[in-house]
């Protein structure tokens, strides 16, 4: 199992009841995907295991999962803070021009005039648009608004993002 091709979709927040149910916080914009899962990969501190989904219920802001082989609260407690993952091939397709955050993190960011700025290290979700955090050896931390006027191209195969800096975003 190649963990480089796995994507986190939930985090285990605790147990529920005595029969081995696990409380999961969704880490996806598509929690409805949970109802279509037959199996998931549980990552507990780097140790991976595949588990069949025996039951699922929505509960407040959580989802309650019942997995094959996890039948008691004692066994379930061993998965506290574990991560539910799926293979990258199982991701929902996004419209053209949209990307999952994990696909953008680590891209080299190039300005059309200044050349290489640095690496996209984080994404801040705001109400209006995302903001990309670029770690630049030359300019320090640069905050780039994820808007069409700024983002010119995203080339995942080349691990490259091309942008047009707005005036005032960095000091010359």
Curated annotation (Swiss-Prot):
Every PRC barrel domain range: 96-169
Provide a GO biological process annotation: rRNA processing
Organism field? Syntrophomonas wolfei subsp. wolfei (strain DSM 2245B / Goettingen)
Subunit comment: Binds ribosomal protein uS19.
- Gene Ontology MF: a single term: ribosome binding
Keywords of the record, alphabetical order, are:
Chaperone, Cytoplasm, Ribosome biogenesis, rRNA processing
What the protein does comes down to: An accessory protein needed during the final step in the assembly of 30S ribosomal subunit, possibly for assembly of the head region. Essential for efficient processing of 16S rRNA. May be needed both before and after RbfA during the maturation of 16S rRNA. It has affinity for free ribosomal 30S subunits but not for 70S ribosomes.
Question: What protein name is recorded for this chain?
Answer: Ribosome maturation factor RimM
Q: What is the lineage of its organism?
A: Bacteria, Bacillati, Bacillota, Clostridia, Eubacteriales
Family, according to the entry, reads as follows: Belongs to the RimM family.
What's said on domains? The PRC barrel domain binds ribosomal protein uS19.
């Amino acid at each position: 199992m190649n963990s480089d091709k796995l994507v986190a979709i939930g985090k285990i927040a605790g147990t529920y009841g005595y029969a081995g149910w696990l409380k999961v916080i969704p880490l996806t914009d598509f929690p409805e995907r949970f109802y279509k899962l037959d199996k998931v990969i549980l990552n507990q501190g780097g140790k991976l295991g595949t588990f069949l989904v025996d039951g699922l219920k929505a509960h407040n802001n959580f989802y309650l999962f019942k997995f094959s082989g996890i039948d008691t609260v004692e066994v379930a407690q061993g998965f506290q803070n574990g991560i539910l993952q799926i293979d990258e091939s199982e991701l929902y397709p996004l419209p053209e021009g949209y990307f999952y955050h994990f696909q953008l993190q680590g891209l080299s960011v190039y300005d059309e005039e200044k050349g290489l700025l640095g690496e996209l290290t984080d994404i801040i979700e705001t109400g209006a648009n995302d903001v990309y955090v670029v770690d630049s050896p030359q300019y320090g931390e640069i905050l780039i608004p994820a808007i069409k006027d700024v983002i010119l191209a995203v080339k995942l195969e080349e691990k490259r993002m091309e942008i047009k800096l707005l005036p005032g975003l960095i000091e010359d």
